[in-house]
Amino acid sequence: MRTPDTDEYVGKTIAYKYRVEALIGEGGMGKVFRARQLSLDKVVVLKVLRHTLLSDERTVARFQREAKAASRLNHPNSISVLDFGQAEDGALFIAMEYVAGQDLHQILSREWPLNEGRVVRIVSQVLSALSDAHGAGVIHRDLKPENIMVEPRRNEPDFVKVLDFGIAKITDSTDDGPALTRAGFVCGTPEYMSPEQARGSQLDHRSDLYAVGVILYQLMTGLLPFESDSAVGFATKHLTEEPPPPTRRRPDARISPAMERLILRALSKNPADRPASAEAFKAELQAVDKERRRMDSAPRRSANSSAVLAPLPRKSAASPQSDVRDATLPGWGNEVTMEATVRALPGVLEPLPANADAMAATRETTDSLVHTQPGAGGSSGVAFFFKSLTILLVVAALGFFAYYFFMGAGSGGAQDLPYALPTNAPVPAGANNSAVGASPDVPLYDRAIVSGARNVERALDVAREGDKALQRADVGLAATKYREAFSRSGDPELALKLGEVYWHRQNPDKEEARGWWNRHLREQPASKARALIEQRLNGAVAQPTSP
């Protein structure tokens, strides 16, 4: 004899309005079917509770809770509940919109690695759905890749739907019925549980943000932040262990430093150290992506370009590969050498001359000579010879001018800059004093940047001002801007830049450079710049006490 828990529903009509077409999944609580709503000829999903559970008051209440929680939500990225009712045989069902896609777990299994831009698009939509849910007083409590559906839409190849509010918590006083949780009661999926959830403590919306941090970690690395063979093992690690940085788990993955910092902040044990809300989390995530796109669109020097003059000679000898920039931009997954980072700092090793307008005019003249091709006939060959000679003389003159300007002339030695670089300034001008958590006599590179003072978007804007100053050879202003940006973000790539600025000034400040490079290495232990830094400082890079 067949029981109601078999797939006997397929081909039948439930509640006189849903014709069941196929079984598409099942779990401990029931089965999930694809069905067609007859009155609208619309495909829907039916979740049917098992008959054997109808006598369990808590399970029935949980099933009703899912319908109630999801029905409160009205957001494009949240699954919509269409109906709740009882079948002819007494089984309870929920009718929901049908999503023709795959869940995020399937995407991870089939398509990893995912590029950072795609991850940002997907997770931003998840955070939008959570922001709406949290505003409606609903905490998901079981967010994981299997509960995130992704389907292609006309204007979005990865359109997200967050589903399965089966253990959602409704936080207002209008909720009635039997309590689904009690002190010390733990529900959820252990791999994605926040520490407070694993402890059985009272939860708020920041518990969901921790789960988003776990998902982000997994999307960027293909791995969970913690590994265990048991639910208890996962819960213990969420409670007691710090997650290893994503780039340490996957040194080959393309993970920007800003993305790594955001992931680790979302995984903070203390909810107060995580992003304050889903909306704030989304804003920080999109700021990370904005900077990534800016770096991706930055002009790169072509190794094959022969139609323009080569840049002025460097002050120090360049490596044989110095004219070829790594296709990977600085700061991505620690894949770039220090030399590539130096090349990303225009003006430090190749500063403009004092009379930049004259140099631009000279380059325009020489460019026109380079682009002039020899014509037919003997006289054109002679003309081409003299034009080539002219180019060589111009380049030599420019080189001599640059050497004279930057190294000084005669026996006077190196000329000092007409301004002083800021050194060990505790807080740069324009920065917020609350941005650093130490006494004023502690150098900026040894300070902890407290979470309450972080402003990633402002830091990116200030760092761009520093880049522009560096392009104008205004090294002093560049250093000031980089320091201010660092005080707002703690970005280890800014520490690397500041080390370069102080090391390559005319009168190098090696102690200041050492301080900034130590900070970079402390934040990025696997940095590919380590070998070159230690070589420059003769192996004297000491690891300072963590701030």
UniProtKB/Swiss-Prot annotation:
SUPFAM superfamilies: Protein kinase-like (PK-like). It comes from the Bacteria. Keywords: ATP-binding, Kinase, Nucleotide-binding, Serine/threonine-protein kinase, Transferase. Residues 290-299 have a biased composition (Basic and acidic residues). Residues 18-288 form the Protein kinase domain. Its EC number is 2.7.11.1. InterPro entries: Kinase-like_dom_sf (IPR011009), Prot_kinase_dom (IPR000719), Protein_kinase_ATP_BS (IPR017441), Ser/Thr_kinase_AS (IPR008271). GO terms for molecular function: ATP binding; protein serine kinase activity; protein serine/threonine kinase activity. Residues 290-327 are annotated as: Disordered. The keyword Transit peptide does not apply. The active site is at D142. Gene3D superfamilies: Phosphorylase Kinase, domain 1, Transferase(Phosphotransferase) domain 1. Pfam families: Pkinase. ATP binds at I24, G25, E26, G27, G28, M29, G30, K31, V32, K47. It catalyses: L-seryl-[protein] + ATP = O-phospho-L-seryl-[protein] + ADP + H(+); L-threonyl-[protein] + ATP = O-phospho-L-threonyl-[protein] + ADP + H(+). Belongs to the protein kinase superfamily. Ser/Thr protein kinase family. This is Serine/threonine-protein kinase pkn3. The gene is pkn3.
